[in-house]
Structure formats: structure tokens, C-alpha cells
């Protein structure tokens, strides 16, 4: 709800945003986001079009006038190739699904990113497999401003080879102090919530 409230304010109070793309897992894109819009009175003026299903259904959804266009991440590459709409804001729901810089969805979002004024990434596991995951995610958020434009730059700054066979490196480990340095770099655009901050346990 917090993200949708912010979108509503940007769209109808400050008029800074006109069309928003939301990318998420299929069930979340198809069910959760539209349900949140229906649930809260202050969000009822926001309209959405859910871009899922067959190619025909997706094309029809893109032709429908809406404030929010919600697509499942598996169809992001298709959307970037077939959609002529301009989005001035993007929400990546489950940002960690963009952690692989070799994946087609990362490349599609990277190409779209310079055209977008605002971007928000939501995730419960930003570095599920370690700090190396963070580079691709923040490359999309700030276009390389904080952790570098290239993975090699990030790797050389904060990591050292771990498992290797001669000149072939299989894995990397953080340099001493790297974790704190990385978190300090991204702190100004990162909000981290702990369960203990907002859950009342019995």
C-alpha cells in the first residue's frame, strides 16, 4: 500500500508521474497489485491494466488507458519489444529477480531505465546469495552511480578471488570492510525494515 500511496500522490497531487509500469511475479502482478487498489479507498482513483496472459490479451491490455500497467517479469522482455508507451516511473516488485546481469529481463530493464524518471525496487532478500547480487539490482536503480557501471568495477573494488584453478576464478569473497563500505554507498536510496520494527510478537 505504501508504494501505491506514493504513486497516487505523485500522480494526482504533485503531477510528477503520468504512467507507471509495475513488474512482478505472475501471481503478484495478476492478483495482488489489483487487489490492493480495490481494497483502499484513497487508491480508488488509480486505474490499472494487467498485462498478462496470451499475446492477444497482453496487446489488448496495453491498448487500454490506465495509470498503472502491471506485467509479470516473464513478459518484461516482450513488453519492452512491443510496447510503444512511455513510462516515467517503474516499480520492480521482487528486485532480487534482477540480480543476474546476464539475464534477458535485466538487459531489457537496463535498456528501458534511462527513459524512466523514477524507479523503486521492492524485495525481502536483496542479497540472498551474497553481496555480489547487489550490483545488478542497484545498476538498475541508479544506473551505476553508487556501485559502478560495470560488474568488473564492482568486483575489483570490493572483492578478491576465493575459489580458483590457476587463472580461472570460480568465486569471490568480500574484502575486509567491504560489506560496510557497500551498505554505506547505497544507504541514501535504501530503506530497510526489520520484522521487529513493525510486528508485535505474542
Model-flagged regions — what are they?
Residues 1-16, 108-110, 141:
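Walker A/P-loop NTP-binding motif
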Residues 2, 17-39, 128-133:
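Conserved Walker A/P-loop ATP-binding site and its immediately adjacent core
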Residues 45, 89, 106-198:
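Conserved P-loop NTPase motor "coupling/switch" region that bridges the ATPase
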Residues 55-89:
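Conserved helix/coil segment N-terminal to the catalytic DExD/H
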